[in-house]
Amino acid sequence: MTELTDTTGACGEPVAVVGMACRFPGADDLQGFWRLLRRGGDAIGPGAGLREGRRPGGYLRDVELFDAELFGISPHEAALMDPQQRLLLELCWHALEDARIAPTAGGATGVFVGSCSDDYALMSRMSAVVDPYSMTGTARTFLANRLSYFFGFTGPSAVVDTGQSSSLAALDQALGSLRRGECSTAVVAGVQLNLTETGDRLIEELGAMSPTGRCHTFDRSADGIVRGEGAGVLVLKPLDAALAAGDRVYCTVLAAAVNNDGGGASLTTPTQTAQQSVLTEAYRRAGVDPAEVAYVELHGTGTKAGDPVEARALGGVLGRGRPADRPLLVGSVKTNIGHLEGAAGIAGLIKTAASLFHRELPPTLNHRRPNPDIDLDGLRLRVSTRRRAWQPDEGPLVCGVSSFGLGGTNAHVVLGEAPRREDAAAGPGEPAAAAGEPVPVLLSGHTDAALRAQAALLADRLDGRDDLDLRDVGLASATTRAALPVRAAVVAVARPALVARLRELAEGTHGDGTHADGTREDGTREDGTTVLTGRPGAQPQDRPETQPQDRPARGDGPGTAATAAAAAFVLGKPVDWLAVYGPRARPADLPLYAFQRRPYWLDTTTSAGGPAAEDAAPQWSGDPLDLVLDLTVQILGRAPGADLDLDATFTDLGLDSRMAVALRTSVARATGRVLPTTLLFDHPTPAALIEALRSDDTKGHEFR
């Protein structure tokens, strides 16, 4: 057995979980997942859609859908990207928003992703589709590096593969990185998509697949695993930093430990001694007496070999010394959603973190008669099969989460309840919001449809919520959300009027008066609200001369200041939002971004493999103007027919090196010509490229 080394430091500073997002079977988001767990929901079912005819499992809906435009990814590249990358991009965006961090903030954030599956890469290679985007689309390293690149994260960026314990092993690395000061914030993720039947057959050949299609953790009926899929993302900060910033804390991570069996009966047979060792070390590092642990989220796969070993290891470390009437409660989310393999650990951790936050333990399913090979009473263990609330006198709570990889890498994480604190009482001075004082509430989206969807979601969130201070809502809208190109602002004095204007924005009935400064306003209503819409960078000369001129001055009161701040936001100008909303405002929880997803999938009917051969007959003739414009717009991911500055360099237009290769390849394929790798270097603007393709020297010849 491999000896453990203390890489994080015994009793190191706790780390706070300040943001979470997930997409699991039967649950499209964190709230849906908690509802599924509380009601004891079973999300196992037969394959459907792209997985039609597959054996029962925990499947995600609509894995082909993705909001490529938001992330600046062309449709062509999106189709060649592993859906696991796409899923992580969207969930990372939501996890940051949940942590009240603007997704465009960037900074010294580390990214640690657990994954052990490459089904889309397998599909790509089997189809012989080779393209400039194939490497970045399917290589596993880009599960982490894609996040770091898009979000502007400068901390460590790593993919961890320890099999089924990958996501908890990734969390262990994140803890070490935070405590060493390599990053100030960490994003930890786990992802698993079961896109082909090959993975099913591999597990079946190993003898680990449940023939009944249900996970029976620690039960007499245990007959193997049920595969599941999904992803979860956590945002972590040092606890002191999170408390100082006023962050919501779901729970704390007190410690983690990872080891390996280092031998045993076989490569895939778990070892009790190693599991006991990793448990002992985790609680030593956390400074927690194992007898005080309230609950452990099991690895709990429901296999005949694995469950008894795990039970005996738990009983030997955490059950010892407990009175018979206070056994350790255990359970497994695999009974709800299946075994998520590379994402299994993070699924169990999100369940446990939510349980600590709500102080309520959801039931574990499919446990009716104990496994005869597991002496639950003697080990002081009890499977928690009913929903139960933790009582106030049971805190502060400590829980554990286990995840064991096929091949012997074991991980255990110790979680603690968030510190209990009361919000600072209002002191002397201005209240958070003076009655009747106008407050700007901001919205933005990458498309008009996204903006309307955000308005509808926010109206639903605010409707009937008398407890929400408009200044808190406004501050959150200004500081915890990305400021995207399509913008709107509502200046309101009361929640009902704000909700009414948001509904008008959602329905597109808010008016369209356009000012010379580029903003659009429907005028100040009798209820004191004003609605502004527009885009950053709008110029007065771009507007029709018949439109109204600048608004007349309305004095120097708060209404003028609020409207001026709203107009500045709409036009992309800087604003001191803390000064606008005041020092008492605290960001409220807002709806998460409404992605505008479309289907993208690998096209295996045609090969995308490189330019035509040198002796190929030309397949295209005509003016290259439309060809270059259409291909460039498509590769940039812009709407068909979008304007393009022909004299701007391809770099300034947004083409990176991979996009440049894709453009050269597409032009070559369309024209039937063999083009040099330096094509866009030699002709760096669309106008230059069009002229080169038009010249007599290139027609009917190789273009070198």
Name each region found by the language model.
Residues M1-C11, R520, R525, A565, ...:
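Regions immediately C-terminal to embedded phosphopantetheine-bearing carrier domains
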Residues T2-A433, R481:
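Condensing-enzyme catalytic core of the thiolase-fold
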Residues V15, P83-R86, A305, N410, ...:
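Phosphopantetheine-attachment site and its flanking helix in carrier
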Residues V18, T385, V401, L415, ...:
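Flexible, low-complexity linker/boundary loops enriched in proline and small hydrophobic residues
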Residues A21-R23, D42, P270-R285, Y295, ...:
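Flexible catalytic loop/linker elements that gate and position reactive groups at enzyme active sites
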Residues L87-L91, A613-A642, M659-A670, E691:
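Thiotemplate assembly-line natural product biosynthesis machinery
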Residues G155-S157, V633-L655, A670-L679:
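Phosphopantetheine carrier-protein modules
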Residues L484, P640, D656-P684, D697, ...:
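Phosphopantetheinylated carrier protein domains
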